[in-house]
Amino acid sequence: MSTGPGLGYHIVDSGGSALPGSLQTNRRLSQWLRFRPDGIVEVSSGKVEIGQGILTAVAQIVADELDVDLARIRMVPATTAASPNEGVTSGSLSVEQSGSALRWASAEARAIFLDAAAQRLGVDAQSLEVRDGEIAGPGNLRTSYWELAEHETGGGLLDRDATARIAPKPATARRLAGVAAERLDIPDKVFGRPR
């Protein structure tokens, strides 16, 4: 079911098609996204900010797909040991590769959280709405990404491989991607802070 912003998700029949971008070779959702108890979403990309604006662009993409405020997104600096292996950083191609991978990973993460919320609240997932990571259902039922992540035992809700079954939102439902935003990398550069 495809719905407006903040509602539902869209399951696609990919016909066995490959996952987009770097998600093909880095399928583990928990390698890309982590939900911290303090209400922050940590996002890992294998691309390095070298002035092309990838940190800001990717943060906007993730915030759109998850229906969270851009201020909740924390981009984790790329490291060889912990980041998805996305090969080289090459200018605007980085947004195409990492951005598409994170768009699909975030869309699937959102659907996973909506399914978990539906089970926890005892309602149909399609009746739930997400606003800034808070999930609301009929009769004022509420939970959040962070509450669900905190109550998950073991490896967590995202400790699984991406499937390409959940399509990202259509461009018309995006509110942040493609809109000018303050660059996340500029303050560190201005104040000489290492990232």
Language model: regions and residue ranges:
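Cofactor-binding beta-sheet edge motifs in enzyme active sites
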Residues: 1-195
